[in-house]
Amino acid sequence: MRSRTYSTAFPAILSLILTGGFVACYLANRSNARPPYRTHRARVAAVPQAPLCGRPNDEQVHIPPNWVSFVPPARGASYADPVFGCTIVRLTDALQEGVAEHHYYATLTPMSADDSKILIVNEHGAWFVTDLVGGIVVPVTKMPATNAGTVLWDGTDGNVFYYTKGNSLMKGTIRGKTVKPSLVHTFAEYEAVVLPDKTDLSINGKSFAMWGGTAGGTHPLNIFTYNMQANVKKTPYVTGCVQNAALTQGSCVHGITQTADNNVIIDFANDGKCLECGNRLWDGNTLVHLQDTTNHTDTGLDLNGNPIFIAVGNSSTLAGLKNPCPGGWGLDVRQQNNISSAVCLLDRQPSWHVSYRGRASQPWAAISFFDDRKPGPELFNKSPGFEAPSSRNWGLYEDEILLARVDGSAIYRLAHARSRSAESYWAQPHAAISRDGKYVIFDSNMAYAQTGCPSGIADCSDVYLIRVQ
């Protein structure tokens, strides 16, 4: 079910990783299955905490107008999505900067806790911070040196983020246009620790999912969660397979995702029924099978406070599972500790990325869609195989960004990303929701649809923002 495809710029990006740079070799983890579906209708008309914009509970195919000719505004300016009505702000300009820029991955929170700043990384692995109209808050030259891996915002302080350096977890505090580094904890038992792909700070803002090990060669990984307030490191899972702990992924582990109860889902590099295959939940004692055949996943709490994960689950992902959606392949919200209990979130979806920071006070998940079929409409205008969108080749939810209420009761379709996702992995929107659910941030290469990527810029894309609450 999962195919792992590399960016077109993978060889160069891999080289950067090996020097502690950009973690952009992130592999696509997705389903290509497209069986027949039956319509799944959202069940309530009035929704508490309804978004500010978007089209609710609509199951019609909407082709984006001016797909071939649309040009987004300059950095800092905005436009209204012509189909769904949400206002979209452009935050970056790869052509002007001479480098592609991304908010990174859907399961990470790019927005600060006070909704004032955005963390962005360029294709060379350099992080920087902007405001909500793309103005530079902290330039690349003032950011601290970090290990390979991610940079994570604090859960409450909008001026604080975390990163790793050597075998230490570090705190960065923004002061004007500079950053003051300070030590959170040194893991003396390891040569290197990493905040790898996919994993964000915990919902309660206290805990990190990490791994540690040797910085050179290939050895077992120690995968664990660390609570910085209690200064408690949970019992690590020590892998039987091996890879370099200083890198963000390898032939052993593809990534890790922290759960809402501060445990960790380990996404092993290979699918299958073996112990170190698929997605396995490490609770400090045992490895629990969540998926043998994996797909894009994120975690949080349901409205009753139960830890959940959002993914497609059925007998193809784990023997004995049933999918609650009419089509049998829909996105579901599944209880982490009772995986037979699930509700349908969305049916008939294309390939997706999901982002959830939620609980009862923030019940919305952001979902973005992409397609890499060739020929097709999600290619640059001048690329071989490009086809203008039509009723023949444009699918339900294609290229869209939407919000789904975690109890399955409502869908709000926000915008077309207008990204030509078939061009590369980093052209996929990877929409991410802010911790408080007020903003959605996504990537798009829409500015280059007519011309293709500028010379010297690989996987060209820019970052865009939608306010939804």
Name the predicted role of every residue range.
Residues 55-90:
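Blade/loop signatures of beta-propeller domains
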